[in-house]
């Protein structure tokens, strides 16, 4: 008698995909644009969110879902900006999944929100595998991490629709090769939109903010909303 083998990873991803589809429908009904923000620890996810809140909150109602293995340090920073935020602590899991986001949305209340930013757990591998019902996957690569990261961690670079190259103000102090980096990424993902930025100084955020605003408005128009 043959031994039956079960592909656990495939089953998990299948269940997640079904839940993510339900989330996507809910977001569309509410005309809520969702960004799944992914990066390694320390790349500048929370700093980027704070900049986006500063630049976008005058025109759009924003909510944030914070994902961390432990603590609510980042959520408190968001809360200080008078933005609705829900904290997810995964207690060891290296990524968020659609089930976690479903629960978080109940606490956040997506009704009336134009934009929800999901800060995924700091990791360059697992988060890219799990659909959260988002409109776009946006990743951050910070200059100190090195220009070779697309070759070492290709999945996130190929799955993302937008890439922020953060901490460009530190470029003179590293051997980061911007041209080589962008060439590598373009070969892997020709359609990706890249933004060299500094969350610390604000450089590059005008273009990024304008682009996100355009994406939000385009999604609303596609959903038949004039709001």
Per-segment meaning from a language model:
Residues 127-134, 143-191:
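Conserved C-terminal guanine-recognition region of P-loop GTPase G domains, centered on the G4
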Residues 68, 166, 198:
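Active-site glycine-centered loops adjacent to acidic/histidine catalytic or metal-binding residues
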Residues 170-225:
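Canonical P-loop GTPase G-domain recognition
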Residues 89, 141, 198:
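Residues at the C-termini of beta-strands that transition into short coil/loop
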């Amino acid at each position: 008698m043959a031994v039956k083998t079960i592909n656990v990873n495939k089953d998990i991803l299948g269940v997640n995909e079904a839940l993510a589809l339900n989330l996507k429908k809910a977001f569309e009904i509410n005309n809520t644009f969702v960004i799944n923000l992914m990066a390694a620890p320390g790349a500048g996810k929370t700093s980027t969110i704070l900049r986006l809140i500063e630049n976008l909150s005058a025109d759009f109602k924003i909510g944030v879902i914070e994902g961390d293995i432990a603590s609510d340090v980042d959520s408190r920073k968001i809360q200080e900006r008078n933005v609705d935020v829900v904290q997810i602590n995964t207690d060891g899991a290296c990524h968020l999944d659609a089930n976690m986001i479903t629960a978080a949305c109940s606490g956040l209340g997506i009704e009336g929100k134009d934009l929800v930013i999901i800060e995924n757990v700091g990791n360059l591998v697992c988060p890219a595998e799990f659909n959260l019902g988002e409109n776009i996957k946006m990743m951050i690569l910070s200059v100190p991490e090195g220009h070779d990261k697309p070759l070492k961690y290709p999945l996130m670079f190929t799955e993302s629709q937008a890439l922020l190259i953060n901490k460009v103000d530190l470029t003179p102090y590293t051997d980061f090769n911007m041209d080589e980096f962008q060439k590598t990424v373009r070969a892997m993902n020709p359609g990706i939109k890249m933004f060299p930025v500094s969350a610390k100084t604000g450089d590059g955020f005008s273009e990024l903010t304008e682009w996100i605003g355009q994406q939000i408005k385009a999604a609303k128009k596609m959903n038949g909303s004039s709001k």
